[in-house]
Amino acid sequence: MAPKGSERTVKKVVAENRKARFNYEIVDTYEAGLVLTGTEVKSLREGKANIAESYATDEGGEIWLINSYLPEYLQANRFNHETRRRRKLLLSRREVNRLQGAVNREGMSLIPLRIYFNERGRAKLELALGKGKKLHDKRETSKERDWNRQKNRLLKERG
């Protein structure tokens, strides 16, 4: 058995919300399981999913993923799933309470960052707790990114 520090985690990313880090200031991230049907898992394994317009919300003491798009599995015929149905997220009670408190008291948002398969083959969602950025914050982020690109170009040219 290998020592604990030498474990490698292999994550196959299926869908990523690339705009989330631009539109939100990420405070904390959580790993949540997804309650999926068989055809949804097969569709995910094909790498077809979109979480760009999705969000998570708290309803009745549970966290739900809303508006995520998992296309129909072509070989499933009449037993297919709804493409944009609400999907329950599996989190521990302590994590749910922490997220509810942050959303209700501090006005934060629950943003899905990416869906991936962990080393055991389970579909997981990386969920972020974040605050929405104002327009001037977004401009500042893009200016900083442009400056870093220019700086790297200059350093590369000078050798």
Curated annotation (Swiss-Prot):
CDD domains: SmpB (cd09294). SUPFAM superfamilies: Small protein B (SmpB) (SSF74982). This is SsrA-binding protein. The gene is smpB. GO terms for biological process: trans-translation. It is found in: Cytoplasm. Required for rescue of stalled ribosomes mediated by trans-translation. Binds to transfer-messenger RNA (tmRNA), required for stable association of tmRNA with ribosomes. tmRNA and SmpB together mimic tRNA shape, replacing the anticodon stem-loop with SmpB. tmRNA is encoded by the ssrA gene; the 2 termini fold to resemble tRNA(Ala) and it encodes a 'tag peptide', a short internal open reading frame. During trans-translation Ala-aminoacylated tmRNA acts like a tRNA, entering the A-site of stalled ribosomes, displacing the stalled mRNA. Its main location: cytoplasm. Belongs to the SmpB family. Residues 137-159 have a biased composition (Basic and acidic residues). GO terms for cellular component: cytosol. InterPro entries: SmpB, SsrA-bd_prot, SsrA-bd_prot_CS.
